[in-house]
Structures are given as structure tokens and as C-alpha cells.
UniProtKB/Swiss-Prot annotation:
Residue ranges listed under propeptide: 23-49
GO terms, molecular function: sodium channel inhibitor activity; toxin activity
Name recorded for this polypeptide: Delta-conotoxin TxVIA
Comment field (misc): Veratridine increases the rate of dissociation in a dose-dependent manner.
The species this protein was found in: Conus textile (Cloth-of-gold cone)
Length: 78
């Protein structure tokens, strides 16, 4: 019983240690915020201005509702 408890504690500790010391090589949020700040200063170079949505008559995704102006009905933007 003690061995089982020790094993459970060890696994939990190692899991927590792995998440706490994981290296974010892409520097995720920091990189995202600096890019967004740069794009606000230079809106012509901004990728945020490019629309990801679908125009009327194009195929769409029912779950995301990715139509620009209307709604996604039967997988086609209206």
C-alpha cells in the first residue's frame, strides 16, 4: 500500500515538474503580443486585416460560422 502511494505521488510530482519546466521554444504569448503591437503601429503590414471568412456562395463550416456577412446554411454561405 505504501509503495502504491509513493508511486502515485512520484508520478504526480514528475507530471507537475514536466509542465512547470516545459520550454516554450516559440515564446508563444510574448511573441504573439509583440507581433500584435507591431501590427497596430503598421496596419498596412497587418495580417489581422486579412479576412479569414468566406464570401457568399462559398463553402463554409457549420461549427465555426465562418461566413463574412450571412450565415452558413447547408455548408454554403448565404
Amino acid at each position: 500500500m505504501k509503495l502504491t502511494c509513493m508511486m502515485i505521488v512520484a508520478v504526480l510530482f514528475l507530471t507537475a515538474w514536466t509542465f512547470a519546466t516545459a520550454d516554450d521554444s516559440g515564446n508563444g504569448l510574448e511573441n504573439l503580443f509583440s507581433n500584435a503591437h507591431h501590427q497596430m503601429k503598421n496596419p498596412e503590414a497587418s495580417k489581422l486585416n486579412k479576412r479569414w471568412c468566406k464570401q457568399s456562395g462559398e463553402m463554409c463550416n457549420l461549427l465555426d460560422q465562418n461566413c463574412c456577412d450571412g450565415y452558413c446554411i447547408v455548408l454554403v454561405c448565404t
